[in-house]
């Protein structure tokens, strides 16, 4: 139906397109809608389906023309995007630039629109790219720390009839109070669980409830300094009403041969467990090293390439990051968006970090797109077998899961991404830096 289409790239990875549709097609579409009206309209003096077109046009011409224009735009956009060189972002809606569109049967129909597309950029040769990686040292104390974590993971939670202390697992209700000691309902939280001295709660009241007993309630005055971890609370004072509903504690198992056997049946002694822990730590170091190498490579490339990120793509990424932050810190997203940490209140440094990570993702996706290798049936079969082993399921059941949900396309995409990642890491040159401890290395943010 499209007679011609002309496109041009604009700043912000926007594309301006002009679509022209033949006057013959426009007339045919108009007549199609006119006939549909005729088949359904009831006009006094005429049988349904027998109303003359002239009468219908005289009364409903504007409606018919508006429907025709709407239909022409919708269908032509579908056809345009099926073969578009610059693919549109799925979450960005095309914007029609023409203030007023009209049908003239003596002329071809034309309209102009703008949409945001996937950023266009090229990646230069990376064969000489080098990344700096610290040398990781696994000490005896690192192994002991991992054993303590295992003890913690294998502990059980039991009721505690005493008072709240450091390490207590406490379930509380809390709410902010105004100057008249009235509850500010938007801040009310119920059944909030924290571990005193360990949990990073929003208001930072963990140590303020030490000594409280079950069913006890108290009002806490909190003053936040200029360097408080949540900037929206910095230099403010809050009055909180906190009620303790439940107190529990962890029962930690002894570190002995029996514990080693409980962790893994094939382990017989505590020394066997230490060796097992060291092997797992080495695997973690390798995985983290690969993540760090890839992250440094992608960010290094992104710094050298001009990537014009569309505003809607950045906003979508920013919202995802804020939602993830809300989930991790157990903050109500509505409360978060209403505060200064909402999209408008996010500081420039935070936005810049989000933008840089987004550019790294785009660079990696470009490398995947540029890679000519294909995912074979053998690759797919091996991945299904691996997943079946990890999930302790039969391979045919895993295959059935993907087939029923039509997810094989996504699985193939993920397999290719993994293959490209392995190829990049295999060829990437590594420069060793200073020695660091296992814990410091694991806690290092890769930015991936």
Curated annotation (Swiss-Prot):
Chief location: cytoplasm
Coiled-coil regions, chain positions: none
Pfam families (alphabetical): Trigger_C, Trigger_N
Keyword Cell division in record: yes
Catalyzed reactions per annotation: [protein]-peptidylproline (omega=180) = [protein]-peptidylproline (omega=0)
Keyword Nucleotide-binding attributed: no
EC numbers, comma separated: 5.2.1.8
Domain notes: Consists of 3 domains; the N-terminus binds the ribosome, the middle domain has PPIase activity, while the C-terminus has intrinsic chaperone activity on its own.
Entry protein name: Trigger factor
Natural source organism: Borrelia duttonii (strain Ly)
Classification lineage: Bacteria, Pseudomonadati, Spirochaetota, Spirochaetia, Spirochaetales
């Amino acid at each position: 139906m499209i007679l011609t289409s002309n496109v041009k790239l604009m700043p912000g990875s926007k594309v301006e397109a002009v679509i022209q549709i033949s006057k013959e097609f426009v007339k045919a579409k108009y007549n199609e809608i006119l006939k549909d009206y005729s088949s359904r309209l009831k006009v006094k003096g005429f049988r349904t389906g027998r109303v003359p077109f002239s009468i219908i046009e005289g009364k409903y011409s504007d409606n018919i023309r508006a429907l025709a224009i709407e239909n022409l735009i919708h269908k032509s956009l579908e056809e345009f995007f099926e073969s578009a060189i610059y693919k549109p972002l799925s979450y960005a809606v095309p914007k029609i630039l023409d203030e007023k569109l009209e049908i003239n049967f003596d002329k071809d129909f034309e309209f102009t629109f703008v949409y945001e597309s996937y950023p266009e950029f090229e990646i230069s040769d990376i064969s000489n790219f080098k990344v700096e990686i610290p040398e990781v040292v696994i000490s005896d104390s690192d192994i002991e720390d991992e054993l303590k974590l295992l003890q913690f993971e294998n502990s059980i939670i039991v009721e505690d009839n005493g008072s709240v202390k450091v390490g207590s697992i406490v379930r509380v209700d809390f709410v902010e109070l105004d100057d008249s000691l009235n509850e500010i309902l938007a801040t009310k939280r119920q059944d909030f669980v924290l571990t005193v001295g360990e949990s990073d709660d929003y208001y930072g009241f963990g140590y303020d409830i030490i000594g409280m007993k079950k069913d006890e309630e108290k009002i806490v005055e909190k003053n936040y300094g200029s360097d408080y971890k949540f900037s929206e609370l910095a230099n403010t004072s809050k009055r909180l009403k906190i009620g303790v509903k439940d107190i529990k504690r962890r029962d930690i198992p002894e570190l002995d041969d029996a514990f080693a056997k409980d962790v893994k049946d094939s382990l017989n002694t505590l020394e066997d467990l230490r060796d097992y822990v060291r092997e797992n730590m080495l695997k973690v170091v390798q995985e983290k090293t690969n993540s760090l190498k890839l992250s440094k490579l992608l960010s290094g490339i992104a710094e050298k390439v001009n990537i014009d990120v569309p505003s809607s793509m950045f906003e979508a990424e920013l919202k995802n990051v804020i939602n993830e932050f809300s989930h991790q810190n157990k903050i109500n997203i509505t409360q978060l968006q209403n505060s200064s940490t909402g999209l408008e209140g996010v500081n420039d440094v935070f936005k810049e970090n989000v933008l840089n990570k987004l550019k790294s993702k785009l660079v990696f996706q470009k490398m995947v797109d540029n890679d000519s290798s294909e995912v074979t049936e053998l690759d797919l079969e091996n991945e299904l077998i691996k997943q079946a082993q990890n999930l302790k399921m039969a391979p045919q059941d895993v295959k059935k899961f993907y087939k029923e949900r039509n997810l094989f396309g996504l699985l193939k995409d993920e397999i290719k991404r993994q293959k490209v990642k392995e190829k990049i890491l295999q060829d990437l040159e590594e420069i060793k830096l200073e020695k660091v401890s296992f814990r410091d290395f694991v806690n290092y943010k890769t930015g991936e």
